[in-house]
Structure formats: structure tokens, C-alpha cells
């Protein structure tokens, strides 16, 4: 199946339990899938959320604030799914494949949101740079933690450095973004991403 930006958005489960806030985030996710973030209006969000503009402004001051919250929660959910998919006692090659497989699973479920995170968030300006950086830092820490698992330790593979983790994060994000933009099957990146990640981790182990 070809994966493109028209695929259905996955449900959003923000930390806040407020039902209207959750519905508004889901409404934005649906509108991004339907027409993209830039063309989405608050009217679109409340239409999908089946609520009112008044309710929207009780939760968020702007479309941008809602977008940032959506991406924050989506990022945390993705990390949670990746961590849950990795068996820390498995051979480290297998752990890398499990992590990348889970990453691709999430992209398949909500390609438009992931693409917005990579492409559209930076265009909002310097005020959201800290949000994007925090998301990247969370991914870096996840990779460092995974590479500290027993499966890596058994083969004397040291934990990934922050620099190595950043290279992996940046490369995977860009590869995934280009694949989605080209309306290709994102599963096609798995073998290449796994091979590149294994090679980079192995090279790092040799130089440490």
C-alpha cells in the first residue's frame, strides 16, 4: 500500500484528561490530514472536533498553540510506542530493527502529522524552536537509553553518544519525510535504515 499524506490520522491522547482539549487536538489532526496545517483554520478544527470556537479559545490562544500541543503529544506517543516495541534483552541488531519498525508503524498511521512536525513547525519561527529541540532531545535520549540495554552490553557495544544519536535521528527523520512527500511506501525505508543504523553503531563501538 502506498503511504501518503491523505492517510487517516491516529487518535491523539494528550496528558490532559480534558475531553474538549482532546477533541480539539484530534480535530486538528484530522484537518491536517485533510488539507495540511497551513490551510487549516480554527473553523476546520472545531468542525472536526464538533465543538465551538468559544470552546477552542478556552483551551488554546491560537491555532499555533494547538498545533504545538498536538506535536508534543504525538512525539511523546511515538517514543512510548518505540520503547514498548524494543526487547532490551534481544540481540542489538534486532533491537534496532524493532525500534525502526515501530517508528515506521507510527508514520504509517499518521504521515501528515509527522510531516508537519518535520517541515512546518520550523516555519513558525524562533518562538517554537525550543519545542522542536525538546522533541529532538527526547528522541536522542531514547536512543541513548536503548543502546544501554543488556542486548548491547553483551556484545560490548557502548551507549550511543549524543552526537551519534543526533545523526541517527536527523537521518531517519529526513528519510521518512522525503518518502512521505514522494507518496511512497514508507516501509521501503526499513531495511536501509536498519543497515545504516547498525553500521553507524558498530563504527562508534570501534572508535570508542
Feature-to-residue mapping (PLM):
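Short secondary-structure transition hinges
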Residues: 105, 112-141, 156-158
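Amphipathic alpha-helical packing segments from all-alpha helical-bundle domains
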Residues: 76-79, 126-152, 162-170, 174, ...
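Hydrophobic alpha-helical connector segments
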Residues: 69, 83-109, 164, 190
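N-terminal intrinsically disordered/low-complexity leader segments
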Residues: 1-19, 154-156, 205-208
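Hydrophobic/aromatic-rich alpha-helical bundle segments in the mid-to-C-terminal region
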Residues: 118, 150-196, 204-208
Amino acid at each position: 500500500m502506498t503511504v501518503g499524506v491523505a492517510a487517516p490520522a491516529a487518535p491523539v491522547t494528550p496528558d490532559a484528561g480534558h475531553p474538549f482539549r482532546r477533541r480539539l487536538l484530534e480535530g486538528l489532526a484530522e484537518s491536517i490530514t485533510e488539507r495540511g496545517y497551513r490551510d487549516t483554520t480554527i473553523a476546520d478544527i472545531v468542525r472536526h472536533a464538533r465543538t465551538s470556537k468559544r470552546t477552542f479559545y478556552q483551551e488554546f490562544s491560537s491555532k499555533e498553540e494547538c498545533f504545538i500541543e498536538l506535536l508534543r503529544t504525538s512525539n511523546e506517543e511515538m517514543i512510548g510506542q518505540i520503547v514498548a516495541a524494543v526487547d532490551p534483552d534481544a540481540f542489538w541488531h534486532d533491537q534496532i530493527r524493532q525500534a525502526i519498525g515501530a517508528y515506521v508503524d507510527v508514520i504509517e498511521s499518521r504521515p501528515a502529522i509527522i510531516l508537519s512536525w518535520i517541515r512546518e513547525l520550523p516555519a513558525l519561527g524562533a518562538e517554537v524552536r525550543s519545542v522542536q529541540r525538546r522533541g529532538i532531545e527526547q528522541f536522542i535520549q531514547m536512543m541513548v537509553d536503548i543502546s544501554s540495554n543488556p542486548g548491547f552490553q553483551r556484545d560490548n557495544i557502548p551507549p550511543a553518544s549524543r552526537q551519534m544519536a543526533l545523526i541517527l535521528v536527523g537521518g531517519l527523520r529526513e528519510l521518512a519525510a522525503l518518502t512521505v512527500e514522494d507518496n511512497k511506501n514508507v516501509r521501503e525505508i526499513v531495511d536501509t535504515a536498519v543497515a545504516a543504523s547498525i553500521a553507524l553503531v558498530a563504527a562508534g563501538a570501534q572508535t570508542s
